[in-house]
Swiss-Prot record:
GO terms for cellular component: cytosol; nucleus; THO complex part of transcription export complex. Residues 166-202 are annotated as: Disordered. GO terms for biological process: mRNA export from nucleus; mRNA processing; poly(A)+ mRNA export from nucleus; RNA splicing. Signal peptide: none annotated. Pfam families: THOC7. Residues 53-151 form a coiled coil. This is THO complex subunit tho7. The gene is tho7. It comes from Schizosaccharomyces pombe (strain 972 / ATCC 24843) (Fission yeast). It is found in: Cytoplasm; Nucleus.
């Protein structure tokens, strides 16, 4: 569309140049007089005006291109900003939906509690007192359990100690080297008895 418009402008503005070319070619076939020279000057003036208009048109087109490029950059920047804002809004929407879902869950959980109604201050103090008594009882039971456990551990350690002592008395540790030395000594004192014993065995 724009190319067609440009071509139509150039087609219209080509006329002064064509007239000048035609007149210059006509000078070769006829004599040049003052009237023809004035006509030629007029054609040159028209051509100069044509070039001036063409230059102005080119300058105007360049300005239009600059304006168009500026508008294009603004539009692109605006589109990028809009995309970023849309993405942020989508994230905010997801967060809001998640918060709404949690609130609905909290409301469902709170309905049974709220349906019972709020207790009076006296009832709350009584409940707190009962809880404190229960805590004290549990602490006392824990302390007694620790004492009993320590006592049983001491008794077990003492019993184990006594058993080890009794075992050392009933079964004293033997020394293999001393037993072998005693056997050799007894054989040295009675060699005949040892040999006779071997002979009988044979």
């Amino acid at each position: 569309m724009e190319e067609t418009a440009i071509r139509s402008r150039l087609t219209v503005e080509e006329r002064p140049l064509k007239r000048l070319i035609s007149r210059c070619l006509g000078f070769a076939a006829q004599n040049v007089d003052e009237a023809n020279l004035r006509d030629l000057e007029i054609e040159f003036s028209a051509l100069s005006a044509f070039w001036l208009r063409l230059q102005m048109q080119l300058d105007m087109n360049a300005k239009e291109v600059d304006v168009y490029e500026g508008e294009l950059k603004k539009t692109q920047t605006f589109c990028e900003a809009e995309k970023t804002e849309i993405s942020q809004l989508e994230q905010d929407l997801l967060v809001a939906q998640e918060e709404l879902r949690k609130r609905e869950q909290y409301d469902e959980l709170a309905k049974p509690i709220m349906s019972k109604g709020l207790r009076s201050r006296t009832e709350q103090q009584e409940s707190i007192g009962k809880l404190q008594d229960a805590i004290r009882e549990l602490e006392e039971e824990n302390a007694n359990y620790v004492k009993a456990w320590n006592l049983r551990k001491d008794i077990f350690d003492e019993t184990l100690k006594q058993m080890n002592h009794l075992q050392s008395i009933l079964h004293p540790p033997s020394n293999p080297e001393s037993d072998s030395e005693e056997g050799i000594a007894s054989e040295g004192e009675n060699p005949s008895s040892s040999s006779s014993t071997q002979y009988k065995a044979k």
